[in-house]
């Protein structure tokens, strides 16, 4: 039993530092293929979110635009 638990734990253990312990504990209860799918979706979501957020920061007008002098 411990051996199978250890092998299940083997893959997502790399992501342990970036997840809260409660979320990680819940993900351990899900079987391996489904868990891998969830991790893949989360990774994809964060990649897309980071890219969109960086574009949003680029497209924001400069702080000078909001200064009272230009108004």
UniProtKB/Swiss-Prot annotation:
Keywords: Membrane, Transmembrane, Transmembrane helix. It is found in: Membrane. Its main location: membrane. GO terms for cellular component: membrane. The chain crosses the membrane at residues 44-66. It is a single-pass membrane protein. Partially overlaps BUR6. This is Putative uncharacterized protein YER158W-A.
């Amino acid at each position: 039993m411990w051996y199978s638990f250890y092998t299940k734990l083997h893959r997502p253990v790399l992501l342990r530092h970036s997840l809260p312990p409660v979320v990680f504990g819940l993900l351990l209860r899900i079987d391996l293929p489904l868990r891998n799918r969830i991790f893949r979706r989360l990774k994809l979501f964060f990649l897309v979110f980071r890219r969109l957020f960086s574009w949003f920061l680029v497209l924001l007008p400069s702080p000078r635009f909001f200064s009272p002098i230009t108004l």
